[in-house]
């Protein structure tokens, strides 16, 4: 069927902010889809609230709306633009849910908009647990015994029939939110109550637990002519019971017999046909390891995390082709862009093994529950490609950036045997390392299989790795053994440790003896046809398929897996850097390992190397390609951390020099630079011992901000108010020594201001200045940022610009620079300088119209900013007000304190833009998922230091008709100020206490500021968690509360009686 000519304009719904369960894979899918539709000649309108994405760039769609993804706002856009059709299957769960809402509210019918791709009925059949089960029964496809429940009573009734364990899956939620496995009544009550609350339709599916079965996924595609193919089948190494987003996954499956593979393949194709899906779809199945019994677990009728992985694993662009199927094209008339010859209806074949390992945020959340289950906890993932499973696994392990270069983890090495067994029986994020350790201690594969339910095949492969360690230990310096170890995927660092050599020694020996990797192409057809795509992975074989061209090249280092503190913003900058290199006439080569992102789409760069971002793996590419240089500014801390080692190995770094990077990152050199430039910073010093830290704090006076040197996303930063707290921090948060000094700074309360600038050694361009709503002390990534600044005087703005220009020139910055200032009165202090691309670059680029990464890259390559038409100073302010609001994934992470501080906790961001600050902030808050109620009750419980300030806020809440609830201490303060308030009992008092008030939904907002004491048992912690579990906005900073009040005040008319406020003379 040729493409449809009866539609012209298509609205694409994006997936909104990055949260756990819905990350960069949808930016990749959405970008591909918009470009594919434009390629076919349609007009594309995109709506998405996430400014950090490539897809919200103006060149991706014909019109881009960065507005909240809510029924109200999207309906307005539809009424204004009158699109012919809407494509919701590329916006994750958010896009699907929104399409269902728009249809139910009658908006689509009213405006004559049809849904493209998979039809609404099919979406509902796959997503609604009852309809799905009915369809499976009709098809004769087995599903686990289950019941749909709407209350706890119904849950009890089901469990009486089939017994524990049972799995709870809430309907229409994302990444298994609210779900879990229950093994007893207490867990049932807790998980079912949460699940019902979090499901938008208040229903859960309870099913017999088949935990322990093999979890297999098929990524399938179908068109309107009923052509259907399997793009990729994948096997989860972790058995059923762990969310597939948290599982280690291999493609193609390794342990299925041909009969099992065909059995599950036929089931998947039968299901996608019965559902009538048009586009991409993901089918998850459970296979009994001991028989041919299987169950269908679920179907995602949309592009998903797994389809991004399948696209990158096979090279087959699922989202691009799904978008074209949606407008009527069929698989047998579309050419596969990878080979440029074969049609899209050929199933990809793989002659390599792909391994995906999730990246978890537990380095940021010490207290989080690390147990893995049906609710997703990973923020991102890495992928690696090798010729054997061992090679692929070890490459993926060293891509994770968790401080390991091999299957070796200190905690596992030092663990007692019983602890080790527990860690293997109950899966956590580090189970793989404990399994390796158990094998080293002589535990058998059989025992490990019994403990973990992981297939013996994978355990034997890990044993091969452990056996090779022994061979290496026994044959130091043996070149044949070295060759074999490299073939299994061992890193130079791992071999060096076993041979008591340095990593560079091993590299030198290999180079001398020609034990170097070759690069193979990812071509979708196991080398059967020649391929058009320059997409490579390394392995130790004979023939190299990556041909070096005559054109001078530049290598860009990507930012690796998404984690808190280093998100999609860095991928955005990487992609723009690559595009700018191409524009400048060089060959752009990228090295990265994140399967979710646009940067690892083979059509982004001239050449893509899917490799770990370690000095060794990057050097291999450099040795082959011989580029004119390497750019490290855009890959976040990942790339910056490789700079010193690369330069030591003779690599030319482009842009700001290593010496200048070091002057910005090294505390003492930085202070010296500041004093030479005459720029003030808060008093502070570096400590290399606990005693020294105490002495510095006493000298400059409390409160002080303490943090380790060289960190991203404020890891292990804290504000301490006295000696006791400082000692607690020094003992628990950091290991201080001369190699790892700790910075101790005077903490200044003031406004925080952030600036990004581009410099070329002479000209310094400042696209814009952002003012933070939360005062200094809240991590910049967790603050609400406003452009243009709302409360800064002209004098302060001039000072900020002056200091920025002086710093950029003084530190000889070539490329990007990010500075954070604190403003106290008319004094401006520098808090920190990052000589690289930052988290705010995409937001600022979009709202100011200054293509920052593009200009920075061209400056790095030698073009002067003045030649590009820019001059030193702050760019003219754009009309309108723009706010960047952080988005958190607290509902997914139990046991994590949501209070804001110097350590970053948000996973994503949204934008709000309008003509006034209040309207923009309203949109930003709504887009971030905060429901703003024009009336109701506010619950206040604030620390003593904040009570004075809370009085003014409480009075304003009362003025707009909010009822005030407060705990005793706060209530006393309010009563004394003459404000009417209802006292709520503290946690340990009689019911109804504060937790009951929150649970029963009697408060619309909770304002709770931190009393010191981070322990999970503290009252404040329990109040904040209770608010999150019940979906009530909980503000832990009075600044955020004040901003929200401004929004509420602007929405309500004031009602004052005529006598009030009249002054009698």
UniProtKB/Swiss-Prot annotation:
It comes from Bacillus caldolyticus. Coiled coil: none annotated. Mn(2+) 3 binds at residues 820, 832. ATP 2 binds at residues 707, 746, 748, 752, 777-780, 820, 832. Mn(2+) 2 binds at residues 298, 300. This is Carbamoyl phosphate synthase large chain. GO terms for biological process: 'de novo' UMP biosynthetic process; glutamine metabolic process; L-arginine biosynthetic process. The lineage of its organism: Bacteria, Bacillati, Bacillota, Bacilli, Bacillales. Large subunit of the glutamine-dependent carbamoyl phosphate synthetase (CPSase). CPSase catalyzes the formation of carbamoyl phosphate from the ammonia moiety of glutamine, carbonate, and phosphate donated by ATP, constituting the first step of 2 biosynthetic pathways, one leading to arginine and/or urea and the other to pyrimidine nucleotides. Residues 930-1065 form the MGS-like domain.
């Amino acid at each position: 069927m040729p493409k449809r000519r009866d539609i012209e304009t298509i609205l694409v719904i994006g997936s909104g902010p990055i949260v756990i369960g819905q990350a960069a894979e949808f930016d990749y899918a959405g970008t591909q889809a918009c470009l594919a539709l434009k390629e076919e000649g349609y007009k594309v309108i995109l709506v998405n609230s996430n400014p950090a994405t490539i897809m919200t760039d103006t060149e991706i769609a014909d019109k881009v709306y960065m507005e909240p993804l809510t029924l109200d706002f999207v309906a307005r856009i539809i009424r204004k633009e009158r699109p012919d059709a809407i494509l919701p299957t590329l916006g994750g769960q958010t896009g699907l849910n929104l399409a269902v809402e728009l249809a139910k509210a009658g908006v689509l019918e009213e405006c004559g908009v049809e849904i493209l791709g998979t039809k609404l009925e099919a979406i509902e059949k796959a997503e609604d647990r009852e309809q799905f089960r009915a369809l499976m029964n009709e098809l004769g496809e087995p599903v686990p015994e289950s019941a749909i429940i709407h209350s706890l009573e119904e849950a009890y009734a089901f469990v009486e029939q089939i017994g524990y364990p049972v799995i709870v899956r809430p309907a229409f939620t994302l990444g298994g939110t609210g779900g879990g496995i229950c093994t007893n009544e207490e867990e049932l009550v807790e998980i079912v109550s949460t699940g019902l609350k979090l499901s938008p339709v208040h229903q859960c599916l309870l099913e017999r637990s088949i935990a322990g079965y093999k979890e297999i996924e098929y990524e399938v595609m179908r068109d309107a002519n009923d052509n259907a193919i399997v793009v990729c089948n994948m096997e989860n190494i972790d058995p059923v019971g762990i969310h597939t987003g948290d599982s280690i996954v291999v493609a193609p499956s390794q342990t299925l017999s041909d009969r099992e593979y065909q059995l599950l393949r036929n089931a998947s194709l039968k299901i996608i046909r019965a559902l009538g899906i048009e586009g991409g779809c993901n089918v998850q199945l459970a296979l009994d390891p001991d028989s041919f019994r299987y169950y269908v677990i679920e179907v995602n009728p949309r592009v998903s995390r797994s389809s991004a992985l399948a696209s990158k694993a096979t090279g087959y662009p699922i989202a691009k082709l799904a978008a074209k199927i949606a407008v009527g094209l069929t698989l047998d008339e579309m050419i596969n862009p990878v080979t440029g010859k074969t049609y899209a209806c050929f199933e990809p074949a793989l002659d390599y093994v792909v391994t995906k390992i999730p990246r978890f945020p537990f380095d940021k959340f010490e207290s989080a529950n690390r147990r893995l289950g049906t609710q997703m906890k990973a923020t991102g993932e890495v992928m690696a490609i090798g010729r054997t499973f061992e090679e692929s696994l070890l490459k993926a392990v060293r891509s994770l950036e968790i401080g390991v270069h091999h299957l070796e983890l200190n905690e596992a090495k030092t663990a007692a045997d019983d602890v080790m067994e527990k860690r293997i029986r109950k899966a956590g994020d580090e189970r793989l390392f404990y399994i390796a350790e158990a094998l080293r201690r002589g535990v058998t594969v059989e025992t490990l299989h019994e403990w973990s339910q992981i297939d013996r095949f994978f355990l034997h492969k890990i044993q091969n790795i452990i056996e090779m360690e022994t061979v290496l230990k026994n044959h130091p310096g043996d070149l044949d053994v070295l060759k074999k170890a490299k073939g299994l995927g061992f890193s130079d660092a791992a071999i060096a440790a076993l041979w008591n050599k340095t990593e560079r020694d091993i590299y030198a020996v290999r180079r001398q003896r020609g034990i170097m990797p070759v690069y193979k192409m990812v071509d979708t057809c196991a080398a059967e046809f020649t391929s058009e795509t320059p997409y490579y992975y390394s392995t130790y074989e004979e023939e190299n398929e990556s041909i070096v061209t005559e054109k001078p090249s530049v290598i860009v280092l990507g930012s690796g897996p998404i984690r808190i503190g280093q998100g999609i913003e860095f991928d955005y900058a990487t992609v723009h850097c690559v595009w700018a290199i191409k524009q400048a006439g060089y060959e752009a080569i990228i090295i990265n390992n994140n399967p979710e992102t646009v940067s690892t789409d083979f059509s982004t760069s001239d050449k893509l190397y899917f490799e770990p971002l370690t000095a060794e793996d990057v050097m291999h590419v450099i040795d082959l390609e011989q580029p004119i240089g390497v750019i490290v500014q855009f890959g976040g801390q990942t790339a910056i951390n490789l700079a010193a080692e690369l330069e030591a190995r003779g690599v030319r770094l482009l842009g700001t020099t290593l010496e200048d990077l070091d002057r910005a990152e090294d505390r003492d050199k930085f202070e010296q630079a500041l004093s030479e430039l005459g720029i003030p910073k808060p008093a502070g010093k570096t400590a290399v011992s606990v005693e020294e830290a105490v002495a510095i704090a006493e000298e400059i006076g409390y409160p002080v901000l303490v943090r380790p040197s060289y960190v991203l996303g404020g890891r292990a930063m804290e504000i301490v108010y006295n000696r006791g707290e400082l000692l607690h921090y020094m003992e628990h948060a950091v290991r201080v020594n001369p190699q790892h000094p700790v910075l101790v700074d005077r903490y200044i309360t003031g406004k925080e201001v952030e600036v990004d600038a581009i410099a070329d050694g002479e000209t310094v361009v400042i696209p814009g200045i952002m003012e933070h709503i939360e005062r200094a002390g809240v991590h910049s990534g967790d603050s609400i940022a406003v452009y243009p600044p709302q409360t800064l005087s002209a004098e302060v703005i001039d000072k900020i610009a002056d200091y920025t220009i002086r710093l950029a020139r003084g530190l000889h910055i070539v490329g990007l620079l990010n500075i954070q200032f604190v403003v106290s009165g008319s004094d401006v202090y520098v808090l920190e300088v990052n000589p690289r691309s930052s988290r705010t670059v995409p937001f600022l680029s979009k709202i100011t119209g200054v293509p920052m990464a593009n200009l920075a890259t061209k400056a790095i390559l030698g073009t002067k900013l003045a030649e590009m038409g820019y001059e030193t100073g702050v760019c003219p302010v754009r009309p309108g007000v723009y706010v960047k609001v952080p988005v958190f994934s607290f509902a997914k992470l139990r046991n994590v304190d949501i209070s804001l501080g110097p350590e970053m906790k948000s996973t994503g961001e949204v934008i709000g833009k309008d003509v006034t600050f209040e309207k923009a902030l309203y949109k930003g808050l709504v887009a971030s998922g905060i429901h703003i109620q024009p009336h109701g009750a506010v619950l206040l419980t604030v620390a003593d230091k904040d009570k004075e300030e809370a009085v003014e806020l409480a009075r304003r809440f009362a003025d707009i008709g909010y009822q005030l609830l407060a705990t005793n201490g706060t209530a006393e303060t309010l009563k004394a100020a003459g404000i009417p308030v209802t006292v709520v009992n503290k946690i340990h008092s009689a019911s109804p206490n504060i937790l009951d008030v929150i649970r029963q939904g009697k408060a619309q907002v909770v304002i709770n500021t931190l009393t010191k004491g981070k322990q999970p048992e503290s009252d404040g912690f329990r109040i904040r968690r209770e608010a999150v579990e019940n979906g009530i906005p909980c503000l832990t900073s009075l600044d955020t509360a004040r901003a929200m009040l401004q929004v509420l005040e602007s929405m309500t008319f004031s009602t004052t009686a005529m006598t009030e406020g009249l002054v009698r003379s």
